UniProtKB/Swiss-Prot annotation:
UniProt name for this protein: Acyl-CoA-binding domain-containing protein 5A
Record keyword Transcription regulation present: no
Acidic residues bias: start-end ranges: 176-195
Residue ranges, compositional bias (Basic and acidic residues): 236-254, 266-283, 328-366
Record-listed an acyl-CoA binding positions: 20-29, 40-44, 66, 85
Gene Ontology process terms (BP): fatty acid metabolic process; pexophagy
Superkingdom per UniProt: Eukaryota
Single annotated GO MF: fatty-acyl-CoA binding
Residue ranges, compositional bias (Polar residues): 219-235
UniProt subcellular location: Membrane
Topology versus the membrane: Single-pass membrane protein
């Protein structure tokens, strides 16, 4: 009953001390040394007050660490130390195993989790979101300008569909209706609408070039429609985006015009096959863009300059009041030029097949020809091939130089194969020499030793049973000669005695 008379903070402190003191030494939860030092300092401060004992010597590092932790609390009151002890234990209470001491502590502490009012939290979040609603819903003006500038620099604005601009226009108008309260946002959105209108006006003549299909024949004998603009990346970069290429293909399929190819009339089925083959000829993947060499960038720049000039002429012809026949004839001339630039003077499927056969030894896929707007490399591929190659502004020179490049590549391959053959022959010769040496060594080891020794060595050869390195005759001479010398000396002495007598 004494525990009930104690203050609540002291009861909690005593229960927490029991939990720490009864932790199993090899249990699932093991507090760190820093945590135990903190509990020790709070315990000493709560039970004995401030630290007033001398610091241990250097030979007691554990005592020094405990003294430092205790003395760091300074003049902290006992009640505050008890409360800090319990608060630190609450942080690790969930990770400790449940025992009787933990249950007792939970009963003494009670529910110590923080209660959160969900309704208040929701209203606070909504209040915060209303403040940023204008910024989150409307794109900034600078971002829109940067997007338009990036599209103009990359050349994607030419083939950018007008539907997207109209969709953005509708979205911006909806944003104006929603945010009538903020005058600055309305002005920014009106500026965006005006910018999108300018983009739409700027892209209308380009849309006419990329989507319009005049049905008149082309002067160079190629396909009479805008096949060059939807077939290469020099015009609207449509092959880099598969969706735009599909839209161009659908537009060509629904156009309903008659295609004139080398003086023959083909049906809509032939036109669809031609368009699909131009987009999917020898391509490993529709999403990949193949680049033969670094020289393509210069060619692309030249063709893009040519197309920009042709588009400017189209805009001038569209702005000046002229008859429909003049505009159509002017468009036909421009489309004929661009057809030559994009296809290099191809005269239909036959010339493309010739281009494929020409490129097969060089191991270059025809997809790069279609995707980069490069046509046949053969100078005699069609009737209109000479004109575009001379007037393309940069691609023609590169196309004309591809023939010597192909020959140089073939010569390099032949030289490499000849060197490889020489190296293989030298390796084979060395291998034969090595095999001959190995065979001779094997034969020499297989021959008996009598054929390898000279007659003198054969006579001096020691027997197989002799264990020493010295020959048998040498050993016999070394053993016999003392006896022979002694016998000779004895004979000499006997003869001398006879003479004296």
């Amino acid at each position: 009953m004494e525990g009930d008379s104690n203050p609540l903070y002291e009861q909690r402190f005593n229960a927490a001390v029991k939990v720490i003191q009864n932790l199993p030494p090899n249990g699932s939860f093991q507090p760190s040394h820093d945590m135990m030092l903190k509990f020790y300092s709070y315990y000493k401060q709560a039970t004995q007050g401030p630290c007033n004992i001398p610091r241990p010597g250097f030979w007691d590092p554990v005592g020094k660490a405990k003294w430092d932790a205790w003395s760091s609390l300074g003049e902290m009151p006992k009640e505050e130390a008890m409360a800090a002890y319990v608060d630190d234990l609450k942080l690790i209470l969930e990770s400790m195993p449940v025992s009787s001491e933990v249950e007792e502590l939970l009963q003494v502490i009670g529910p110590f989790y923080e209660l959160v009012d969900e309704k208040r939290k929701i209203t606070q979040v909504s209040d915060l979101s209303t403040g940023f609603g204008n910024l989150l819903s409307s794109p900034p003006k600078c971002v829109t300008k940067s997007i338009i500038r990036t599209m103009e620099m990359n050349g994607n604005l030419e083939g950018y569909p007008i539907k997207t601009a109209e969709t953005l226009k509708v979205k911006s108008i909806d944003l104006e209706d929603r945010e009538d309260d903020d005058d600055e946002d309305e002005e920014g959105e009106r500026d965006e609408v005006e910018e999108f209108k300018e983009v739409e006006k700027a892209s209308q003549p380009k849309k006419r070039v990329s989507a319009g299909r005049p049905k008149g024949p082309v002067s160079n004998g190629s396909i009479s429609q805008h096949k060059g603009l939807s077939n290469g990346t020099h015009g609207s970069k449509s092959d880099l985006n598969r969706q735009e290429s599909e839209e161009n293909t659908e537009h060509m399929n629904h156009d309903g015009g008659i295609v004139e190819l080398n003086g023959h009339l083909n049906s809509e089925k032939d036109k669809e096959e031609d368009v699909s083959s131009s987009h999917h000829v020898a391509s490993d993947s529709d999403s990949e863009v193949y680049c033969d060499s670094v020289d393509q960038f210069g060619g692309e720049d030249g063709s893009e300059i040519h197309m920009n000039r042709s588009l400017e002429v189209l805009e001038e012809s569209h702005s000046t009041p002229s008859s429909t026949g003049d505009i159509r004839s002017q468009d036909d001339e421009l489309l004929g030029r661009e057809e030559g630039v994009q296809h290099g003077g191809e005269d239909g499927r036959g010339s493309r097949g010739g281009a494929q056969r020409r490129e097969l030894p060089v191991k270059r896929s025809d997809s790069s020809v279609v995707r980069r707007g490069r046509g046949s490399r053969s100078p005699a591929s069609g009737s209109g091939s000479a004109g575009p190659q001379q007037g393309s502004g940069g691609d023609g020179e590169r196309w004309g130089a591809d023939g010597p490049m192909t020959e140089n590549l073939n010569e390099q391959i032949i030289c490499a194969l000849a060197r490889l053959q020489d190296d293989m022959q030298s390796v084979l010769q060395r291998l034969h020499t090595l095999e001959a040496l190995t065979a001779s060594q094997a034969r020499s080891l297989a021959l008996p030793s009598d054929y390898l020794t000279t007659p003198a060595n054969r006579n001096k050869k020691k027997p197989s049973w002799w264990p020493f390195d010295v020959s048998l005759g040498t050993v016999a001479f070394a053993v016999v000669w003392p006896f022979v010398v002694q016998w000779l000396i004895r004979v000499y002495v006997q003869r001398r005695r006879r003479r004296i007598n």
